[in-house]
């Protein structure tokens, strides 16, 4: 009888150790799986307007227009804002700026409205990609500068100042991090002249550093 008790105790201890190890192993696996998902990129297309999108995708004319209109609404909320037209023109160039709508009209809280009018760059294009699960499309407004001295000159940049290459027509496709399509915060305060250009320059420098680091890692 004593021997039987010893055997049962050993079996129980072994089972308990296995039971404790299994959840830990599963948890570690889950963390790695989530990390992999978070780092995964997605393919998006960039267009100057709805017609540009429709010409490239004749069967998606309705989706092109919907995404374009949604991007325009986002641009009203998230584009950099300037206290004067001159400040905006100095950053983006002549005929590239428009008066920003009042916060309430742009879908923001009325109490956040600053006194006086603000100016913002015109939307120069938009980024369009599949939403998670494939149900519909997500979009982000893109801007560009016609000022040769600006870091954003001739490039598509988003509201945060991140660059996505030449602002060309014809539907350019590229791979971007999932964060690129994440909603951007509404902008209710003005930026100083040249401030957005500094953000673009900083983001471009970070992108180059990241690309260099990735290249070195892959090279061994």
UniProtKB/Swiss-Prot annotation:
Region feature (Disordered): 181-220
Domain of life where this protein originates: Bacteria
A UniProt-annotated Pfam family: DUF1190
Similarity comment text for this entry: Belongs to the UPF0441 family.
Family annotation (NCBIfam families): PRK11653.1
Xref: HAMAP family: UPF0441 (MF_01188)
Protein known as: UPF0441 protein Spro_4274
């Amino acid at each position: 009888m004593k021997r039987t008790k010893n055997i049962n105790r050993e079996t129980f201890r072994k089972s308990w150790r296995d039971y404790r190890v299994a959840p830990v192993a599963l948890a570690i696996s889950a963390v790695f799986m989530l990390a992999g998902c978070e780092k995964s990129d997605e393919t998006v297309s960039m267009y100057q307007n709805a017609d540009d999108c429709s010409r490239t995708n004749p069967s998606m004319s309705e989706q092109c227009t919907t995404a374009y209109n949604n991007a325009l609404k986002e641009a009203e909320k998230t584009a950099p804002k300037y206290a004067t037209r001159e400040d905006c023109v100095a950053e983006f160039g002549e005929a590239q700026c428009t008066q920003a709508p009042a916060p309430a009209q742009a879908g923001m809280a009325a109490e956040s409205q600053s006194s006086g009018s603000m100016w913002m760059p015109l939307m120069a294009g938009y980024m369009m990609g599949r939403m998670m699960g494939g149900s519909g499309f997500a979009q982000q407004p893109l801007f560009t500068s016609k000022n040769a001295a600006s870091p954003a000159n001739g490039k598509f940049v988003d509201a945060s100042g991140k660059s996505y290459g030449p602002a060309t027509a014809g539907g350019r496709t590229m791979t971007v991090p999932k964060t690129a399509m994440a909603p951007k915060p509404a902008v209710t305060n003005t930026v100083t002249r040249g401030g957005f250009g500094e953000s673009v320059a900083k983001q471009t420098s970070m992108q180059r550093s990241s690309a260099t680091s990735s290249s070195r890692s892959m090279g061994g």
